[in-house]
Amino acid sequence: MMLLASLFTVVALLSGCAGTAGTPGAAASSPARRTPVRIATLKGPTGVGMVHLMQAQDAGTTANDYAFAVTAAPEDVVAKVATGDVDIAAVPTNLAAVLNAKTSGAVQMLAVNTLGVMYIVTDGVPLAGMADLKGRTIHASGQGSNPEYVLRFLLERNGLDPDTDVHIVWKSEHDEVATLVAGGDAEVALLPEPFVTAVTVKNPELAVELDLTTEWTKAVTDGSQLMMGGVIARRDFVEQHPDAVAAFLTEYAASIEAAKTDAETTSALCEQYGIIPSAAVAKQALPRLNLTFLAGEDMLAGLQGYFRVLYDADPKAVGGSLPDAGFYYTTR
C-alpha cells in the first residue's frame, strides 16, 4: 500500500493526450528581434508536448522568446488568458470552447496536441470491444464531465443502454478508482493516463483492454476524433503577431514530434519542468498519451464532431453553444 500511495501521489497532480531535444529551435531561423510570447501549460498529458520547446527556449535557439508558466489548475490558466496575462495556453479542448464562450470569442484554437487518454482497465476480464461490457460493473470518476459523456456515447454507439445494460459506479476522484482496481476490488475501471500506468505497475495482473480513442474512431462516421487537449491563443495576439504565431506552431509541432520519438529525453524533461513529477512514470505513460499535432482543416474536422457529442450530452460542457468557424485558427 505504501508503493500504491506513492504512485498515486505522483499521478494525482497530473489529471486535471522524429527529432532531438534541439529540434524545435532548429526548425525555424531566428528573426532579428524575437517576439516575446507568454505561454501557460497544464501539468500532465496536455503539457507533455511542450517540454522540448521549453528546453530549446532555455538554450536560446527558438524563433520567439518564450516565457512558460506551468500550473496544475485549469482555472489558473483560464484566468491568465482572460486577463491577458498569457498569449498562448495548452488546455483541455472543451475548456477552450468554454473560455471562447465566456470571452465572447476572444480566443482561438490553434491546434490539437492530445487525443484521448482514457482507457478501460480490467482485472481478468477480456474485452474485444465496448459491447463486451454488457452486464459489467464499471468503476469510474468524472460524472457530469467529459469521462461520463464519452463513456455513455461509446456505450450507446455499441448498442448498450448505459443506464440498464451496465452498472456504472461513480467515484469522486480518479485515485479512488485506481485504488479499487489495483487492490482487486474492481474488475473493470475507466481511468486516464497516467493513472493507468500507476495501477498496472502496482498490479501487473491488470490489463489495458480498451483505448477509448480507438473505440471512438470505430464508432463514428463523421470523421471526428476524441481530441482532449489543445493550444489556444488570444485572438488579439494572433492578429497582432501572425508571424510569431506561425513560428510557434512550427516549433511546437517539432516539439511534439520529439516527444513522441525520444521517450528517454522526453520523460527526463517532463520531470525537469514539472509536467510529470516522475521521469519513470512519464516514460511508461508516454505510449498511451496519444500525443499529436493537428491544425487547420484536420483540427476542424476532428473537433467539431467531438464538441457536438459533448454539447448533446450537456451544452455547458462547451460553454452553452457550439463554437463558430471563427474559433478555429485555420491559416498557417
Where are these regions (language model features)?
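Short, low-complexity disordered leader/linker segments with a strong preference
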Residues: 1-36
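Short, glycine-/small- and polar/acidic-enriched structural segments
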Residues: 24-161, 168-170, 187-193, 209-210
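Extracytoplasmic/secreted envelope proteins and their assembly/folding machinery
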Residues: 47-51, 78, 82, 93-96, ...
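Short, solvent-exposed loop/beta-turn-alpha elements that line the ligand-binding surface or hinge
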Residues: 57-64, 213-224, 291-299
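Pocket-lining segment of extracytoplasmic ligand-binding domains
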Residues: 94-95, 103, 169, 175-269
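Short, surface-exposed acidic
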Residues: 162-166, 274-285, 318-324
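Secondary-structure end/capping motifs
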Residues: 238-313
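Conserved C-terminal helix/tail region of periplasmic/extracytoplasmic solute-binding proteins
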Residues: 304-332
